[in-house]
Amino acid sequence: MNIFRILGDVSHLLAIIILLLKMWKSKSCAGISGKSQLLFALVFTTRYLDLFTVFISPYNTVMKIIFLACAYVTVYLIYGKLRKSYDSENDTFRLEFLLVPVIGLSFLENYEFTPLEILWTFSIYLESVAILPQLFMISKTGEAESITTHYLFFLGLYRVLYLANWIWRYHTEKFYDQIAVVSGVVQTIFYFDFFYLYVTKVLKGKKLSLPMPV
């Protein structure tokens, strides 16, 4: 396992911790897209169905359990404990616009036509677009809290580091996972504008704001 994957996992975990701490301390989930969090929970669920049948390493197993647990806790807080603060009026992205094409693509483009492999492929494709409801929500409200932007930054950084991981693995092991790499590139592209605003505004102490949709 190379340093890029480790740093990617740390960045991913840090993003989730930032989000959970934000909700726990403020007793509010305002500004957080419950739909994006539902998609991420679905991503981890379909990707880690082999949790109890395939063992790679203690690190791999522990990280799977942590990500699954955090995903379900996040969904519970948004739709359960903190549901009164959930901004459902602005979290209006149509999930079927993502789920239908992702499901179709998972059946058409995969490495092996078996249930577990199709579900794994589904999770990779879905993760690449799961953040769209959150970005749509920010564009709809016109702004985002600083904690939410930090969460999105580390989530985007995780994808960039994982792309570096794939490049490193190809260079050192001649290993290339086309589905994971292409999906990772697509996901990273969605963060480009956000990264620019994060560096030019948030890191300078300014509030991140986006043009309101017409």
From Swiss-Prot:
Family annotation (Pfam families): ER_lumen_recept
Region of interest: Important for recycling of cargo proteins with the sequence motif K-D-E-L from the Golgi to the endoplasmic reticulum: 204-207
Gene Ontology MF annotations: ER retention sequence binding; KDEL sequence binding
Cellular location(s): Endoplasmic reticulum membrane; Golgi apparatus membrane; Cytoplasmic vesicle, COPI-coated vesicle membrane
One GO term (biological process): protein transport
Region (Interaction with the K-D-E-L motif on target proteins): 47-48, 159-169
Membrane topology, from the record: Multi-pass membrane protein
Site (Important for recycling of cargo proteins with the sequence motif K-D-E-L from the Golgi to the endoplasmic reticulum): D193
Domain of life of the native organism: Eukaryota
Side Lumenal, residues: 1-4, 53-58, 111-116, 169-178
Site entry: Interaction with the K-D-E-L motif on target proteins: R5, E117
GO cellular component terms attached to this protein's record: cis-Golgi network; COPI-coated vesicle membrane; endoplasmic reticulum; endoplasmic reticulum membrane; Golgi membrane
InterPro entries assigned to the protein according to its UniProt record, in alphabetical order: ER_ret_rcpt
Cytoplasmic side: 25-32, 80-92, 136-149, 200-214
Residue spans crossing the bilayer: 5-24, 33-52, 59-79, 93-110, 117-135, 150-168, 179-199
Comment on protein domains: Binds the C-terminal sequence motif K-D-E-L in a hydrophilic cavity between the transmembrane domains. This triggers a conformation change that exposes a Lys-rich patch on the cytosolic surface of the protein. This patch mediates recycling from the Golgi to the endoplasmic reticulum, probably via COPI vesicles.
Family, similarity comment: Belongs to the ERD2 family.
Annotated function: Receptor for the C-terminal sequence motif K-D-E-L that is present on endoplasmic reticulum resident proteins and that mediates their recycling from the Golgi back to the endoplasmic reticulum.
Name of the protein this chain belongs to: ER lumen protein-retaining receptor 3
